[in-house]
Design a protein with these regions (language model features):
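PP2C/PPM-type serine/threonine phosphatase catalytic domain
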Residues: 1-255
């Protein structure tokens, strides 16, 4: 079995890119696909902008994952959580005291010839393309999604009540317990369900907000990772960003 990375396309921009006078930095960070332990690792983190140190927090977790010496599906499922929690707490304690509440989301993938691992906390999203549709593989850790999952309110009722879709219930932080989701899709299941050519996308909420508004482009655009990335970026910038916006698009061939 052999995996070939055939295409990568990405963007990561500050919400105020077109209003430099506001001088707000981009608090998203990303892991551009890199080779690790006979597989490929890539991800996105979104620092919580309501606290000081949001950029530093998102950068730290991405840098930490990038620098893992050994990586395996078993490690991601059973060991990473506690190690990341301890190292993040140590990092925050080493910073200025005003960074004590710095927090971040993190969603990343590791793909090798055993399968696809998805490690996720917060509200970035991982999608996989099936025909001309994007299938969401992660669940948002938000109050909005929690109310939906428990069937307390319908989506229509939540919108009528103007419940925010961005209020997080979980994140990487020094003051709340880290409670991530982990998903594993075996190699053969990936091929059976999605074919020998798979496209995986990771987006921050500033990017998928505009995808949710209209979940389609032309068949040609949906069939091309670079065209899709460019089209979504144009849509965001034409409508006006509401948050920092980040996307990584990948295409792999599974032999």
């Amino acid at each position: 079995m052999k995996i070939t990375l055939s295409c990568v396309s990405s963007f990561s921009e500050a919400r105020d890119k077109f209003s430099p006078e506001r001088s707000k930095q981009n608090e998203d960070s990303l892991i551009v696909p890199l080779k690790k332990s006979n597989g490929f690792l890539f991800g996105v983190a979104d620092g919580l902008g309501s606290y000081h140190g949001a950029k530093e927090a998102s950068y730290f977790v991405c840098n930490y994952i990038e620098n893992l010496q050994q990586i395996s599906h078993e490690y991601l499922e059973h060991s990473l959580k506690e190690e990341l929690k301890i190292n993040f707490q140590n990092f925050i304690q080493s910073q200025n005291s005003e960074y004590i509440k710095a927090s971040t989301t993190l969603s990343f993938c590791f793909l090798d010839d055993s399968g696809l691992s998805i490690w996720h906390i917060g509200d970035c999203r991982v999608y996989i393309k099936q025909d001309t549709k994007l299938i969401q593989l992660t669940n948002d850790h938000t109050q909005y999604q929690k109310l939906l999952d428990k069937k307390i309110y319908s989506k229509k009722e939540l919108n009528e009540k103007k419940i925010s879709q961005s209020t997080l219930t979980n994140a990487i932080s020094s003051f709340i317990d880290l409670d991530n989701d982990y998903t594993f899709i075996p190699y053969d299941s990936l091929k059976d369900e999605y074919g020998e050519e798979i496209s995986v996308f990771i987006m921050s909420d500033g990017a998928y907000h505009f995808w949710d508004q209209r979940k389609n482009f032309s068949k040609v655009t949906m069939s091309d990772t670079i065209k899709f990335t460019n089209a979504l970026k144009r849509r965001i910038e034409n409508k006006g960003p509401i948050d920092d916006y980040t996307l990584i698009g990948t295409k792999f061939y599974l032999k």
